[in-house]
Each structure stands twice: as structure tokens, then as C-alpha cells.
Amino acid sequence: MTLSLNTPPGVHCQPLKHQRIPLLQLQLKSQPKSQLKSQPNKVLALKLLPPTLVPLLRLCQLPVLCWLVLPLYCCNLLNLFFNIFLEKWLSTFPSIQLPQNRFISINKIFW
């Protein structure tokens, strides 16, 4: 049994092996470069995207649960770095005694 696709002559389709390829990417692969130049602005925009935006675009495809967990994880990392920096800075003052607990809560400092 064969599947008929509307492809230009000379373009051979290979079956996908557990892989999701966006439709636009398939269209870009199957068309000659001369046809790509006459395409609308979205193709041009895709070519002009800086490579640093690619990971951000992939992040947008994450499930909602990851969007809830990632900010908490980043906040914990920031808190950790802040505590380490604060501990080193406070240790320069001999009159300040640091608590036994290595990490100082930000709330204890400001309140």
C-alpha cells in the first residue's frame, strides 16, 4: 500500500521514524531555493532568527508543569548564590557572628 503525496517531481519522501518535523520545515526541504526566495516573509523571518532564540523557542513548547517548576528552580539558585555571596561579604566584618546555619534567610536580614 502506498501513500500519495502532492510533492513536486524529483522530490522523494522518506517515512518519518518517530520524529516530528514541522510542516514548514518539510516545505522548506522540498522546494528549490529559487522558490524559497519568492515565499512570504515568514520564511525570511525564520532564516533571520538568531541562533540564541532557538532554545527559547523550544522552551515555549514545554508543558505547563515545567513553566511552574522552572521559575522556582531559578529562584532557588539565585537564593543560593546570594547566600554564598552574603556569607563571604559578612565574614569580612569580624564583629558580625554568622549563625551555625550556613545559609542566611533573606527575610531575617531585611525584617
From Swiss-Prot:
It comes from the Eukaryota. This is Putative uncharacterized protein YDR133C. Keywords: Membrane, Transmembrane, Transmembrane helix. It is a single-pass membrane protein. The chain crosses the membrane at residues 64-86. It is found in: Membrane. GO terms for cellular component: membrane. Partially overlaps YDR134C.
